[in-house]
Amino acid sequence: VGIGDLFSLRIAGNIAGQKVLGSLEFACQAKGSKVILVLGHTDCGAVTSACQLRLQQKQISDVKEMPHIQYVLGPLMHSVESVYDIMQPRELNKTFVNQVTAMNVHYNIQYIINNSTVLKDLLDRGEIAIVGAIYDVKTGHVEFLDA
């Protein structure tokens, strides 16, 4: 992997799962990628939908028109609940959704570290870095998050 080369993974809701872990392990262990960037973005439809469900006191199973949406929204609910517990007012607005987006980036970094011994070992040895950021879809600005 050279300068400017990317091994890109995209998934609705920016959710790390088993397939994402496998792809990240391949990118780092087999292909030599040195940085994992967990990049959330503003105006994320999946994050907004998860927030909306919680604020309306609905369950994912209430979304009948998309029977597989549980695999996208389910992992987001941890971040939604974390923000819901600490934030006032609890309403569907830009501030609430942005806080959930940032929390979700942090949560997924921890998920990667806690669920992949390969990536954790590479991280502990200083062979890779895992960083989080939020991409603003309106301005193109990327804000890197504190660890």
Question: Which ranges hold each PLM region?
Answer:
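Divalent-metal-activated hydrolytic enzyme cores
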Residues: 4, 13-34, 45-147
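Short helix-loop-beta junction
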Residues: 1-8
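Conserved functional hotspot residues or short segments at active or partner-binding sites
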Residues: 38
